[in-house]
């Protein structure tokens, strides 16, 4: 059924017919496409047509709606009007004015709250309708749309300069949710444009509407239409409070919307409102009155600026601190028309104030939720950062108080540790110097002992050389051996061979033997005396057989220790007592008398001399004279004992 046919229906509509049925609303479809609040899609109108509607379309539908409004009688004056629809469903069906008519489609704003009942809070009467009776027509204006410009931003729905819901043009916080240029006005039409001029019927009709059943749910949260909230994603008009002083011609200009503390400029945005007598209505009233709205935002989705950081907390603060005084404007409008309606309007305005404060706390869409999460994260991060900074400052203060003595203790400990380290270093240096000094002294002593030992060895060598030379000369004379000119050279032994021409007369031992063999005792005694003289001239006989090294150790007391060490370490030096004495076997002098005379020949004497020479080099007792075996002294007396001694 078209809107023209509905407008021709009888105007007998009861209050019961206007009451929405919750049971029917529970079956209402919520899968339909979302539309911006303030723009209600008519079943017979497509989206593109609703976006591009002109002012003539608004005028046509406004005439139809006004005819329906004038045909509804007034009833109880204390009934309230709601301006909110169900929150849980995006679109809800509203009751039709006449039985049998097709119910218009009610599109709720995209403020969806999970849970709650299907009942909606009562609708708020638009303050601009209250001033309908006092408003005057302006025949010079031809447009019925509301245009918003960014040339001079001011409050569009939150405040009005005179007699609106918000009498003050600015909130105490100095900000408003929606800005509008003060010179942008909404035009109203006169009777010549097709609108009735009976202004008293509209408030009466609205006040005679019974309760629509759209009451708050159990959680006391409004879930229906929420006029007055303009978010970044859904920039729909809310509660346009425009009085007769601000009604001027509209212009298609740019719009500057201040959202969350940032100004957004959106060119060519035309906001169209459903109007009754040229006065805009709220989306809830337009749906209840079966008024199709053709006003569409040209650019419904706006991009948020990077500086948009304020969230619903700022919205709540700006709204709660803006000193809402709907009672003042409501009282001023109602007292001029009907004093009986004053109480109901005041009550509804009070309810609207409470519901408005609750509604502003609800997030409008997913983007708003995301921004809220971001804000919470930023707030939590900033709060944690501030807490951390406070803790750090407190800890720095405490540490500044506690570190003063701690630093002193550390300095003292460092000094002590440094002193200990210095002492340890000095001790190590002292020990090192002492060690080096001991090594130096030991090295010097060792060098000194080495020099002394070398000198001692040289002296020993010289001593043994002199002793060797002395003994060599004596033994050479006794044996008839002529030593060489040099003591270091090999011995040159000239042994006389037995021959007739050269008897062995050079050997004293041989001469003595020959004298004895001839029984020439006088010659024998002379040979023995010579031999005794040679032996007495030796150094060994003069020392009495003592070791000269022992005498040197006794004379030099300073070298006693070194000498003992040398003796113990050098076992190659034989001791004095271990040296054999050559003349340890003595023979008696009277043994020569026992020698028997024999008629031996010279050959026998020669053999005896040869045996004597051989015995000097091979026999251990070279001084034993080997006589004939039959003439050998059986008593074994020492022969040298009979030799004369030169005392």
Curated annotation (Swiss-Prot):
* Region annotated Leucine-zipper, chain positions: 454-461
Q: Where is this protein chiefly located? A: nucleus
Q: What protein family does this chain belong to? A: Belongs to the bZIP family.
What Gene3D superfamilies does the record point to? Answer: 1.20.5.170
Q: What is this protein called?
A: CRE-binding bZIP protein SKO1
Q: Which residues form a coiled coil?
A: none
Q: GO CC terms on record?
A: cytosol; nucleus
SMART domains annotated for this entry? BRLZ
Subcellular localization is given as: Nucleus
**Annotated Gene Ontology MF terms?**
DNA-binding transcription activator activity, RNA polymerase II-specific; DNA-binding transcription factor activity, RNA polymerase II-specific; DNA-binding transcription repressor activity, RNA polymerase II-specific; mitogen-activated protein kinase binding; RNA polymerase II cis-regulatory region sequence-specific DNA binding; RNA polymerase II-specific DNA-binding transcription factor binding; transcription corepressor activity
Location of the region described as Disordered in the Swiss-Prot/TrEMBL record: 1-119, 135-204, 305-331, 353-429
Keywords for the protein's UniProt record, in alphabetical order: DNA-binding, Nucleus, Phosphoprotein, Repressor, Transcription, Transcription regulation
Phosphoserine PTM sites in chain numbering:
94, 399, 558
Regions of biased composition (Polar residues) lie at 51-85, 357-368, 396-405
What is the additional note? Present with 504 molecules/cell in log phase SD medium.
Superkingdom of the organism of origin: Eukaryota
Q: Which organism is it from?
A: Saccharomyces cerevisiae (strain ATCC 204508 / S288c)
Offer one example of a GO biological process linked to this entry.
cellular response to osmotic stress
Pfam families the record matches: Aft1_OSA, bZIP_1
In residue numbers, the region (Basic motif) covers 430-451
In this UniProt entry, the residues modified to Phosphothreonine are 113
Q: Which residues form the signal peptide?
A: none
Q: Where is the composition biased (Low complexity)?
A: 138-194, 305-329
Function, as annotated, reads: Binds to the CRE motif 5'-TGACGTCA-3' and acts as a repressor of transcription of the SUC2 gene and most probably other genes.
Domain bZIP as annotated: residue spans: 429-492
């Amino acid at each position: 059924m078209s809107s023209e046919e509905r407008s021709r229906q009888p105007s007998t509509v009861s209050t019961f017919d206007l009451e929405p049925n919750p049971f029917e609303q529970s079956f209402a479809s919520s899968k339909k496409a979302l539309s911006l609040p303030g723009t209600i899609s008519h079943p017979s109108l497509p989206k593109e047509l609703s976006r591009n509607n002109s002012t003539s379309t608004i005028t046509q539908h406004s005439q139809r709606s006004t005819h329906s409004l004038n045909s509804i009688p007034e009833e109880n004056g204390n009934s309230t009007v709601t301006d909110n629809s169900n929150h849980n469903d995006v679109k809800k069906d509203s009751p039709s004015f006449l039985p049998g008519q097709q119910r218009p489609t009610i599109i709720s704003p995209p403020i969806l709250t999970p849970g709650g009942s299907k009942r909606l809070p009562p609708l708020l009467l638009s303050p601009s309708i209250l001033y309908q009776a006092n408003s005057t027509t302006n025949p010079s204006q031809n447009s019925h749309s509301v245009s918003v410009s960014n040339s001079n931003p001011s409050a569009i729905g939150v405040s009005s300069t005179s007699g609106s819901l918000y009498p003050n043009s600015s909130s105490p916080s100095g900000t408003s949710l929606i800005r509008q240029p003060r010179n942008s006005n909404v035009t109203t039409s006169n009777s010549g444009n097709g609108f009735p001029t009976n202004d008293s019927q509209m408030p009466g009709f609205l006040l005679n509407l019974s309760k629509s059943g759209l009451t708050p749910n159990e959680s006391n949260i409004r879930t229906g239409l929420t006029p007055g909230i303009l978010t970044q994603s859904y920039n729909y008009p809310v509660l346009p409070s425009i009085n007769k002083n601000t009604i001027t011609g509209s212009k298609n200009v740019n719009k500057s919307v201040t959202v969350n503390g940032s100004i957004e400029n959106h060119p060519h945005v035309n906001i169209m409102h459903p109007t009754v007598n040229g006065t805009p209505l709220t989306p809830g009233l337009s749906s209840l009155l079966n008024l199709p709205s053709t006003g569409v935002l040209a650019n419904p989705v706006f991009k948020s600026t990077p500086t948009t950081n304020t969230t619903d907390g700022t919205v709540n603060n700006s709204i709660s601190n803006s000193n809402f005084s709907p009672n003042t404007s409501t009282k001023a409008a109602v007292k001029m028309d009907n004093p009986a309606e004053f109480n109901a309007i005041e009550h509804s305005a009070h309810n609207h104030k409470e519901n408005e404060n609750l509604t502003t706390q609800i997030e409008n869409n997913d983007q708003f939720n995301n921004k809220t999460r971001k804000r919470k994260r930023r707030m939590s991060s900033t709060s944690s950062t501030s807490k951390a900074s406070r803790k750090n400052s407190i800890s720095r203060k405490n540490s500044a108080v506690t570190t003063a003595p701690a630093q002193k203790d550390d300095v003292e400990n460092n000094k002590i540790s440094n002193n200990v380290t210095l002492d340890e270093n000095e001790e190590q240096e002292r020990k090192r110097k002492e060690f080096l000094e001991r090594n130096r002294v030991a090295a010097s002593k060792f060098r000194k002992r080495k020099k002394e030992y070398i000198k001692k060895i040289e002296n020993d060598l010289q001593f043994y050389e002199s002793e060797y030379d002395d003994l060599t000369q004596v033994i050479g004379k006794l044996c008839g051996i002529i030593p060489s000119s040099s003591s270091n050279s090999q011995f040159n032994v000239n042994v006389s061979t037995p021959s007739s021409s050269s008897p062995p007369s050079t050997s004293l031992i041989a001469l003595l033997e020959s004298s004895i063999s001839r029984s020439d005792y006088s010659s024998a005694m002379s040979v023995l005396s010579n031999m005794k003289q040679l032996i007495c001239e030796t150094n060994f006989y003069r020392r009495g057989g003592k070791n000269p090294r022992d005498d040197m150790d006794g004379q030099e007391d300073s070298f006693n220790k070194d000498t003992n060490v040398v003796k113990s370490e050098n076992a190659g030096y034989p001791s004095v007592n271990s040296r054999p004495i050559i003349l340890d076997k003595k023979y008696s002098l009277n043994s020569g008398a026992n020698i028997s005379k024999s008629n031996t020949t010279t050959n026998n004497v020669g053999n005896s001399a040869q045996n004597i020479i051989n015995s000097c080099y091979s026999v251990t007792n070279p001084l034993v004279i080997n006589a004939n075996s039959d003439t050998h002294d059986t008593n074994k007396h020492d022969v040298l004992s009979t030799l004369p001694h030169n005392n």
